[in-house]
Amino acid sequence: MNFIENESAQKLRGGYYTPLDLAVYIVRWTLDNNPKNLLEPSCGDGIFIQALSEMELPIGLSFTGFEILAEEAAKARDRCKNEPRLNSSIHTRDFLEWAINQMVDGNSKFDAVVGNPPFIRYQYLPEESQQKAETIFKMLNLPFTMHTNAWVPFVLASISLLKPGGRLGMIIPSEIVHVMHAQSLRTYLGTVCSRFLIIDPEDIWFDGTLQGALILLAEKKNSPIDHSDGLGIVKVVGRDFLSGNPADLFNNTARINGKTVVGKWTKALLTKSERELIDSLYEHTDVHRFDQIA
């Protein structure tokens, strides 16, 4: 176990910036829905703004970005100045604090959210930030754990601020698939999203870290009572997938829902026949949980 005084400044601020080709891929998918306004909750030096500048943009697209570090926010503003097609505003402030106010008032809703939220252990966050993270969970009536990570409340708040039918595209830690502290997020995605896709790479995308990361693409339900098609997971090797249309992966990947997405998502990596075999073993009269016999 590492102590906070032994961690690097980069790790303590969770700043692992997105490669441009991945940002372009995510932006391409969110723009496919013809958004009028777009949110980035942790814009860093503005790499997603750069990605937007390489795309054909909807007329009058509004971009709202947040970055807590003034030096990085200034870089993002410089990128905005070079993209006159965007009606952009970059705020140097805490996104979670702003998001809590918006969730209370219900004033701001977005057609799309993109980004790469900070990867920071809860224990390394300032006390004020810890309280804001816990508040996000409480506002969404989700169980909270102090084992969480900053990226989890960032994603929760971002989905909450999406309009019905809105899209979210983010790079997040691969631990979303299995860790207990992401269970509330997995549950929330399964409840409020009509479809969501994990693009899970074999490679490490960020230099200088062993942290695995993946792409999450999610589409919010138009109505809370709508059916959810659930989760799809695509394993990729290398970056060849980036030359394809993200909409093809999102629309054509086989999905699972129901009890399979209630817990850990590792079952989604199995074939349908493998899942059916495991389910039949669970229900077999001669198979028992360990806590039932010990």
Language-model segments: what does each one mean?
Residues 11-12, 16-25, 42-52, 57-61, ...:
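Signature of N6-adenine DNA methyltransferases within the class I
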Residues 76-87:
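Short, conserved SAM-binding/catalytic segment
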Residues 35-42:
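Conserved class I S-adenosyl-L-methionine
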Residues 28-33:
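Glycine-rich helix-loop-beta junction characteristic of Rossmann-like nucleotide cofactor-binding loops
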Residues 1-7:
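N-terminal, positively charged/glycine-rich alpha-helical extensions of SAM-dependent methyltransferases
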Residues 85-95:
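Conserved SAM-binding strand-loop segment of SAM-dependent methyltransferases
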